[in-house]
């Protein structure tokens, strides 16, 4: 098993307002985490950034699942109704696979994953490692200390407008 302590450090260095803002605006007119209780506000959200990690596809106990209501803000100033702990335990007992983890905050997942809060999580079994694949050996690299590691690849789709800015359409 692996235990991971997640830290929401999405704040300015002094931890005081104005808070670090999400890369993309959060639509407060939809049901979302809403740490400041501004239900339905049409203004830009300017409060602390809520976050919660979810290991997508993992077989984990519910307290370590990172459900959408388990979010918390920096310093635990606000916590979602599903918050239990910032430390998750992953049993890692399922078959070897590539999983991915991402922010799972209620109503904000689409924007936080789009902004890059996502990464790979590998489960391996040395007894089941393929020595070679049809195209050759596994794509491995070596660091400056001679340690071999695998290269993970997560592909995400991005759209850009004519000015080269990220485009996240609000309709369709």
Feature roles, as predicted:
Residues 1-172:
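Histidine-centered copper-binding motifs that mark active-site loops
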């Amino acid at each position: 098993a692996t235990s991971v302590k997640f830290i929401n450090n999405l704040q300015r260095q002094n931890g005081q307002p104005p808070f670090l803002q999400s890369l993309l605006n959060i639509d407060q007119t939809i049901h979302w985490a809403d740490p400041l209780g501004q239900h339905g506000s049409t203004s830009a959200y300017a409060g602390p950034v809520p976050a919660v990690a979810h290991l997508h596809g993992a077989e984990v106990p519910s307290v370590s699942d990172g459900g959408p209501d388990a979010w918390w803000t920096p310093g635990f100033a606000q916590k979602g109704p599903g918050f239990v702990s910032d430390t998750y335990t992953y049993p890692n007992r399922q078959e070897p696979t590539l999983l991915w983890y991402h922010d799972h905050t209620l109503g904000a997942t689409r924007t936080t994953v789009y902004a890059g809060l996502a990464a790979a999580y590998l489960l391996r079994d040395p007894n089941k490692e393929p020595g070679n694949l049809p195209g050759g050996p596994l794509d491995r690299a070596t660091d400056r200390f001679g340690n071999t590691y695998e290269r993970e690849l997560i592909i995400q789709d991005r759209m850009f407008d004519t000015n080269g800015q990220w485009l996240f359409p609000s309709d369709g």
